[in-house]
């Protein structure tokens, strides 16, 4: 205080020796004990025996300085450069960090209220900084300007409120310093004015409480303003996200990276684009219908041509000629040509053989005319008979070939096996013809060699002439048959050429049909692609609808928050008005106090002349005090030396503890060695029994007990360390203790490792099941080791208890020494207090008179400044009120605009949902119509095939068509179920809308509940109508379809609509909620019943699904 030189910056401990110790209590009475001769604040301090006296002006200035700012010790500013957490505001000394270049001034001397004065320019926004505004590219200019304006207004309001806080804090601290400095003097020397001072003090205390409340209210307002700023930032962020969404949407459609603003033009553009897409979808649907009609007509023409092909090619028995069919046709024609060539070859062979036969017969006729009958003639006759038999076999082969040709023409193609058989027959015929030629040559040679004998055989050949005539007749008949066969072959070749031409014509027509079908298929694929694109567009629209709904919810929440903010700001305006009234009353009270203080200052100026004589006595008393302080310092040095000796003793104790820890580590190493022995024993073991398992369990229990004892030992060691830490204060001892703790943790790790190995060994021991005797011996050895370890643990416990007792004794001795030191220091302090009291009794009169005069002058100046400050505050509060009113009006305008935009978005949402439903219903209708057309086409094909003549293949085709028809019927059933689901989803969406509208309002009114009830009733009537259509269809077709299905109770109820609506108007909100739940249950039951009827229809008679679809259209 008097030695600290009133400086906060550089504080040197060397300049503290003549000054006051920081440990001494702060007293306002010792505010001007030691100072320099010039009244400065830093410089050379006056020594104990300087003998200089201070003038009255210096004393008054010193007292004024000490009264305004209070004493500042070195202990108060030892942590000037230390780091403190951000935004911690306490009602004590300021400990916050300030940026470079900002002065920090202490604003009061009270130990309870202090603050740091920060320049208003350094006050930042939120966490002492504003985020950089980097949304210029995404945020529109109007929104950016509005945001900047609001942020600037809020910053100015924050600065004004903080300035008010600083001024109020200064007033509070000044008042407290005045009260604390003037109360003691009034008690002793100014008894007539004691009552007045007490009244003033009470007034000041009440004003201080009022100011504190005002300060708290201003803090709350600051917090609320920060909350509003954050809300506005969130709103700006949401607006930016909306703009980015619209920008992305517009860039994906047009390819131009333009910035989309949320305006009515964007909504109109979106709506126009949506209408254009709907028109395109309608045109696409029309073209799809036209293409489907064209496809159906093409299918009918194709079916007609197929039927004609079937009629023309019944021999081929195939519906259509694909690429494989054309190849088969080529093979068939090739086989027919080969068969014709084979027939021509056989005919030529027959002609040659007939010529040879005729030649032979003529020769035989000539030679047998005169030849006698002998055995040779008989041989010749047998040869001729053999030739006749061969000719007949060849004729049979010809007939077989003709039959094969007819089979080829009827069946269309010869199989590979038949072809191989034909080749074999051809080879047989060729070999036979060669054999015959060889025989004829041999006969010629025999005839030439035996010409002499022919004459003898002529007589015998006369009898054979008749037979030869018969052979001739047979040969003529065979010639006629050959001519007939040739004519048949020519007709067959002509028919084959005609069929070839017809097949080529049919092929050309089929290729044309295939080309047209390919074109139609490409068109259908293109239409499907366009349908998929439209479905993706619909999905995008649904996503946009969901986003709009989310935006609607967020904007509704923002509207609610804005309403709350409006209410809060209105409350703030009321509070500010009350503040202004209170400040005006305070100004009046301050003016009255100023007048009374001026009168008292005039009366006190006469008492300032008697202060010079008391200064000399004060200086002598101060010199005596300095001597006593030096004695106390010497005693403190002695106490420190004694404490150092105690610390050395503790170090020795720590060494002993280290030795004990090393002993414990040796025990651990022994345990590890025993564990290694256990491992070796476990590897040598091979079997184990139940007795060994029980002994192992006992060993585990013993190990757990050891663990618990180790943990107890560690806890005891920790307690001993904590006791030693309490007794020690040097850094070396703390380092050694930390080293011991690390060793203890290492010991724990080693014990945990040992425990893990023990567990692994136990598992190995459980697997071993042989060699019981060896294991018993080793278990006994382990038990002995456990007993030894238990003994060691007990010894360690005993040693630890002895060490604990020693440490407790040492702590008690240290406490006794500290108590003795405290007693001696207390005695010295008592003697010092007595001397101080004596000195103070001499000083009181002079000091208090000087203080009172100086204080009165300062009070006058401060009251004037407080009055001007209060006037400024009143003006600033009025300006703030006007700004708050303007903000209220702007927020109201924003509310109205946001509500309008919300209404527009809701209408847009409902339109988009209705269009989506319509598109989905149209798509489902188109699919159902296409399926019905396909089913009818399959039915027509089945009827045509059943009317055809061939049986086997037509039955297979009918079965295939029926399978396709069943598949189409299943698809139709699936589509009807999808349509029913769509109706149910539409109903649920409507119900969700109504429930969501009810949820947005916190407590829905009865009128809001009646509307969804009426919608539920309409849906119920539609479901009843639909179920009625289905039941009539089932009764008309087959009543057994509805066997086992019972309609719900709600289906048979027929209520009067008008009476029911009148009853709804009379019901309360709870009754309406119950009625709503009942209606939902009834609709769910009716929906389930309708689904069950549809399932029965699909199972029993799927052919009436078309009538079901018509019933759906009527009900919808």
UniProtKB/Swiss-Prot annotation:
Entry-annotated residues carrying Phosphothreonine: 38, 1046
The linked condition is:
A chromosomal aberration involving ERC1/RAB6IP2 is found in papillary thyroid carcinomas (PTCs). Translocation t(10;12)(q11;p13) involving RET. In vitro, isoform 1, isoform 3 and isoform 5 participating in a ERC1-RET fusion protein activate tyrosine-protein kinase activity.
Keywords, sorted A to Z:
Acetylation, Cell junction, Cell membrane, Cell projection, Chromosomal rearrangement, Coiled coil, Cytoplasm, Cytoskeleton, Golgi apparatus, Membrane, Phosphoprotein, Protein transport, Synapse, Transport
Biased-composition ranges for Low complexity?
13-28
Region annotated Disordered, chain positions: 1-54, 590-609, 814-836
The name this protein goes by in its record: ELKS/Rab6-interacting/CAST family member 1
Q: For the site Breakpoint for translocation to form ERC1-RET oncogene, which positions are given?
A: 719-720
Domain FIP-RBD residues, every copy: 1046-1108
UniProt feature, compositional bias: Gly residues: 40-51
Phosphoserine modification sites are 17, 21, 37, 55, 75, 94, 1005
Q: Which domain of life is it from?
A: Eukaryota
């Amino acid at each position: 205080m008097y030695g600290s030189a009133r400086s906060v910056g550089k504080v040197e401990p060397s300049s503290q020796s003549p000054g006051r110790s920081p440990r001494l209590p702060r007293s306002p009475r010792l505010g001007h004990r030691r100072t320099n001769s010039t009244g400065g604040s830093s410089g050379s301090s006056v020594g104990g025996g300087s003998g200089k006296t201070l003038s009255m002006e210096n004393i008054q200035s010193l007292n004024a300085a000490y009264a305004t700012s209070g004493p500042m010790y070195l202990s108060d500013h030892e942590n000037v450069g230390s780091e403190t957490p951000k935004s911690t505001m306490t009602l004590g000394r300021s400990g916050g960090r300030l940026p470079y270049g900002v002065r920090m001034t202490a604003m009061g001397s009270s130990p309870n209220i202090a603050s740091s004065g920060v320049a208003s320019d350094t006050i930042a926004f939120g966490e002492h900084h504003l985020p950089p505004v980097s949304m210029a590219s995404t945020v529109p200019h109007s929104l950016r300007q509005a945001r900047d304006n609001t942020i600037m207004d809020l910053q100015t309001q924050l600065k004004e409120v903080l300035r008010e806080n600083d001024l109020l804090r200064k007033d509070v601290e000044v008042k407290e310093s005045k009260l604390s400095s003037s109360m003691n003097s009034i008690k002793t020397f100014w008894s007539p004015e004691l009552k007045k001072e007490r009244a003033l003090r009470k007034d000041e205390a009440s004003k201080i409480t009022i100011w504190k409340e005002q300060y708290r209210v201003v803090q709350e307002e600051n917090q609320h303003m920060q909350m509003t700023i954050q809300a506005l930032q969130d709103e700006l962020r949401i607006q930016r996200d909306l703009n980015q969404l619209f920008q992305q949407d517009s860039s994906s459609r047009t390819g131009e990276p333009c910035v989309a603003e949320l305006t009515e033009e964007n909504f109109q553009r979106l709506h126009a684009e949506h209408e254009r897409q709907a028109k395109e979808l309608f045109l696409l649907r029309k073209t799809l219908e036209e293409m489907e009609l064209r496809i159906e007509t093409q299918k009918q023409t194709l079916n007609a041509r197929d039927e004609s092909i079937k009629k023309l090619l019944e021999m081929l028995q195939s519906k259509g000629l694909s690429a494989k069919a054309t190849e088969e046709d080529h093979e068939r024609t090739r086989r027919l040509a080969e068969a014709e060539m084979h027939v021509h070859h056989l005919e030529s062979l027959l002609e040659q053989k007939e010529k040879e036969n005729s030649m032979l017969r003529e020769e035989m006729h000539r030679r047998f005319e005169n030849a006698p009958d002998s055995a040779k003639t008989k041989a010749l006759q047998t040869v001729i008979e053999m030739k006749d038999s061969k000719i007949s076999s060849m004729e049979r082969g010809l007939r077989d070939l003709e039959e094969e040709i007819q089979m080829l023409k009827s069946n269309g193609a010869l199989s590979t096996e038949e072809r191989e058989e034909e080749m074999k027959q051809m080879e047989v015929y060729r070999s036979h013809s060669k054999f015959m030629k060889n025989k004829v040559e041999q006969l010629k040679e025999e005839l030439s060699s035996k010409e002499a004998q022919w004459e003898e055989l002529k007589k015998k050949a006369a009898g054979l002439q008749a037979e030869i005539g018969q052979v001739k007749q047979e040969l003529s008949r065979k010639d006629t048959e050959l001519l007939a066969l040739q004519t048949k072959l020519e007709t067959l070749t002509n028919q084959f050429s005609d069929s070839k031409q017809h097949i080529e014509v049919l092929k050309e027509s089929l290729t044309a049909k295939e080309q047209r079908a390919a074109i139609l298929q490409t068109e259908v694929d293109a239409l499907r692609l366009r349908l998929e694109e439209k479905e993706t567009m619909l999905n995008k629209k649904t996503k946009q609808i969901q986003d709009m709904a989310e935006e609607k919810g967020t904007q509704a929440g923002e509207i609610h928050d804005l309403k709350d903010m409006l209410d809060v700001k209105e409350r703030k305006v009321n509070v500010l008005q009350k503040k202004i009234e209170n400040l005006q009353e305070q100004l009046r009270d301050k003016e009255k106090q100023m007048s009374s203080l001026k009168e008292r200052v005039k009366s006190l100026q006469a008492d300032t002349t008697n202060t010079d004589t008391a200064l000399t006595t004060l200086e002598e008393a101060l010199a005596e005090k300095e001597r006593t302080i030096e004695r106390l310092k010497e005693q403190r040095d002695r106490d420190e030396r004694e404490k150092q000796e105690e610390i050395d003793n503790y170090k020795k104790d720590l060494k002993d503890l280290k030795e004990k820890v090393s002993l414990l580590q040796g025990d651990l190493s022994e345990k590890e060695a025993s564990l290694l022995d256990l491992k070796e024993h476990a590897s040598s073991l091979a079997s184990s029994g139940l007795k060994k398992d029980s002994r192992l369990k006992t060993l585990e229990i013993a190990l757990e007990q050891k663990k618990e004892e180790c943990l107890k030992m560690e806890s005891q060691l920790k307690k001993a360390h904590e006791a030693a830490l309490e007794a020690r204060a040097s850094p070396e001892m703390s380092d050694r203790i930390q080293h011991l703790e690390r060793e203890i943790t290492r010991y724990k790790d080693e014990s945990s490792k040992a425990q893990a190995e023990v567990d692994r060994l136990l598992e190995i021991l459980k697997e071993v099941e042989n060699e019981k005797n060896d294991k018993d011996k080793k278990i006994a050895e382990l038990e002995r080791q456990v007993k030894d370890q238990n003994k060691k643990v007990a010894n360690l416990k005993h040693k630890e208890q002895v060490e604990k007792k020693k440490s407790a004794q040492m702590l008690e001795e240290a406490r006794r020494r500290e108590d003795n030191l405290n007693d001696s220091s207390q005695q010295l302090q008592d003697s010092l207090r007595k001397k101080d009291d004596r000195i103070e009794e001499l000083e009181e009169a002079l000091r208090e008179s000087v203080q009172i005069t100086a204080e009165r002058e300062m009070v006058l100046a401060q009251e004037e400044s407080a009055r001007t400050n209060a006037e400024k505050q009143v003006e600033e509060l009025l300006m703030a009120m006007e700004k708050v009113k303007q903000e209220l009006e702007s927020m109201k305008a924003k509310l109205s605009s946001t509500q309008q935009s919300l209404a527009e978005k809701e209408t847009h949402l409902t339109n988009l949902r209705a269009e989506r439903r319509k598109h989905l219903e149209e798509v489902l209708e188109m699919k159902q119509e296409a399926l019905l057309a396909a089913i009818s086409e399959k039915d027509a094909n089945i009827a045509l095939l059943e009317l055809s003549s061939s049986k086997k293949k037509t039955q297979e085709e009918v079965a295939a068509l029926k399978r396709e028809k069943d598949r189409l019927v299943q698809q139709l059933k699936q589509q009807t179920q999808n349509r029913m689901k769509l109706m149910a989803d539409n109903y649920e969406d409507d119900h969700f809308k109504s429930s969501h509208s009810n949820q947005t309002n916190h407590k829905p009114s009865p009128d809001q509940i009646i509307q969804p009830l009426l919608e539920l009733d309409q849906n119920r009537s539609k479901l009843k109508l639909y179920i009625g259509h289905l039941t009539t269809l089932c009764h008309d077709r087959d009543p057994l379809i509805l066997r086992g299905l019972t309609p719900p109770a709600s289906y048979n109820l027929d209520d009067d609509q008008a009476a029911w609506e009148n009853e709804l108007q009379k019901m309360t909100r709870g009754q309406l909620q119950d009625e709503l739940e009942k209606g939902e249950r009834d609709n769910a039951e009716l929906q389930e019943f309708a689904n069950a009827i549809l399932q029965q229809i699909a199972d029993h008679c799927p052919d009436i699904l078309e009538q079901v679809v018509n019933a759906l259209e009527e009900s919808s």
